[in-house]
Amino acid sequence: MHPAAEHSPLGKSSEYIATYTPSLLFPIPRTAKWAELGLTAETLPYKGVDFWNCFELSWLLPSGKPVVAIGEFSIPADSPNIIESKSFKLYLNSLNQTPFADTASLEATLVKDLSAAAGKPVGVRVRSLKDVEAEGVVALPGVCIDDLDISVSDYEHPRPELLRCDDSRVVEESVHSHLLKSNCPVTSQPDWGSVVVEYRGAALDHASLLEYIVSFRQHSDFHEQCVERIFLDLQRLLKPEKLTVFARYVRRGGLDINPYRSTESVQLPNHRLVRQ
């Protein structure tokens, strides 16, 4: 477990405060998890962002009438801190009985508070249910590898040694799997996700990639670090000209977390999958 997470509200009984309380936000430094992967803030081999979507966003108009909306937040992958998810939920709940003059005022407050917690500017969009409903759900790009026939017996830790490639062939492709699962390092609750790998480099053996993804099944780590580990393991193996790893996780507590790590600029839109 991350030492800072021990002091977070995650896994503990919490009072649900319904009036604006920005102090509820609990930042967790990324440095310890970066160090586990041999990284520092100065040596990150990727660009990226963590997309968060909130489906339980509500506040009051000056008249006292409630409003509901969907919040979209983008936290830079190189920000000093992640925001612990339960504290994020508690903070958003504290808006429920708080009046705001208009949506712009709410967005400005969210930008201020979330940027202070993350240690870097956070993008915020407050969207109407109608707008999000019109977008529907999308399918992941590329080839789904989930129907490949594999045998698996070890689920405790990620196993990069399973990954194989053909160095004699250079390909550019996009593949995805819906079989990503890991566990919360604090509560041990399951985190279910789908992951996309897009790259140009040595041809990756798809069955070995699926075996590797399944090896995360009992691994305990935060969403962000799972994606970073996948990115680094693939980068070491493939030595690619370009590489993107993007995961979309099933929501918990009204929030879903979708980390994106890439050698390229962030391009993928924040569109929901069928499990989101």
UniProtKB/Swiss-Prot annotation:
Q: Which InterPro entries match?
A: GTP-CH-I_C/QueF, NADPH_dep_7-cyano-7-deazaG_red, QueF, QueF_N, QueF_type2
Which keywords belong to this entry? Answer: Cytoplasm, NADP, Oxidoreductase, Queuosine biosynthesis
Primary location group: cytoplasm
Tell me which EC number(s) this protein carries.
1.7.1.13
- Protein name as it appears in the record: NADPH-dependent 7-cyano-7-deazaguanine reductase
Query: Taxonomic lineage of this organism?
Result: Bacteria, Pseudomonadati, Pseudomonadota, Gammaproteobacteria, Pseudomonadales
Q: How does it assemble?
A: Homodimer.
**What top-tier enzyme class does this entry carry?**
oxidoreductase
Task: Tell me the function of this protein.
Answer: Catalyzes the NADPH-dependent reduction of 7-cyano-7-deazaguanine (preQ0) to 7-aminomethyl-7-deazaguanine (preQ1).
Molecular-function GO terms, alphabetical: preQ1 synthase activity
List, alphabetically, the PANTHER family matched.
NADPH-DEPENDENT 7-CYANO-7-DEAZAGUANINE REDUCTASE
UniProt pathway: tRNA modification; tRNA-queuosine biosynthesis
Residues bound to NADPH are S85, K86, R252, G253
A Pfam family annotated for this chain is: QueF_N
This protein's gene is called queF
Name a single GO biological process. Answer: queuosine biosynthetic process
The family assignment reads: Belongs to the GTP cyclohydrolase I family. QueF type 2 subfamily.
